[in-house]
Amino acid sequence: MQAVINVAIAPLTTNPALWAQNPQQSRLVDELLLGMPVEITGEAEQHMVPVRTFYGYTGWVAQDALLTGPKAEEWLVQPQMVVIARWADVLTESRVQGACVAAGLPLGARVAVQGDPEDGWQAVTLPDGRTGYLRADALAPLYPQPCEQDQEKLRAAIAQAAKRYLGTPYRWGGKTPAGIDCSGLCRMAYLLCGISIWRDSELKEGYPIHPAHVSDMRVGDLVY
């Protein structure tokens, strides 16, 4: 069953029982961000649901972090954009004085967009149906394939995406400006440019990464 992440940041864990008892004692393995699609792969246990991410990672996420059923299916087919500000608030009005509909959407979160931007603001819809406005410059296209065909431009775009996380503290399993790990940084930098690589720091068959010699390193290459 398809589902959509319905909160700003949803922790992914491998131990649902321990997480249900004490989240602080259960290891975080990944973070799923608002608007990301997942596949539910089994039955809920202690309010946790087993899922597979769109990039093949598996784990357990809180049941109340998911939107399922027809609403999820309807939202997934709407035009979407991705947040590229480190943090962004969805407001009730297209001005800074608007009340906050949803606070703290992280870099990498996804929203559905309604129409074209007006006066620097973009009308958006969240997975749960709430609507509001984001600054248009806080959003970028959600690329289904590499954002640039020219290799040098693509490499530069990947490096620029990585720089958006400058100053972010290290957090095992993290994937946002609140905290990110090494493979999370690599994955998000590539994903923002339309390339989906494996979540962990390793070469994995079926993902667009191949070995390169350190003497041939160029901008945008990964060093594991």
Features from the language model and the residues they span:
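Short, well-ordered loop/turn sites that connect or cap secondary structure elements
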Residues: 26, 32, 105, 216-217
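...with weaker cross-activation on analogous glycine-rich loops/strands in unrelated enzymes
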Residues: 195-224
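Short, conserved secondary-structure segments in the cores of folded domains
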Residues: 28, 100-101, 210-213
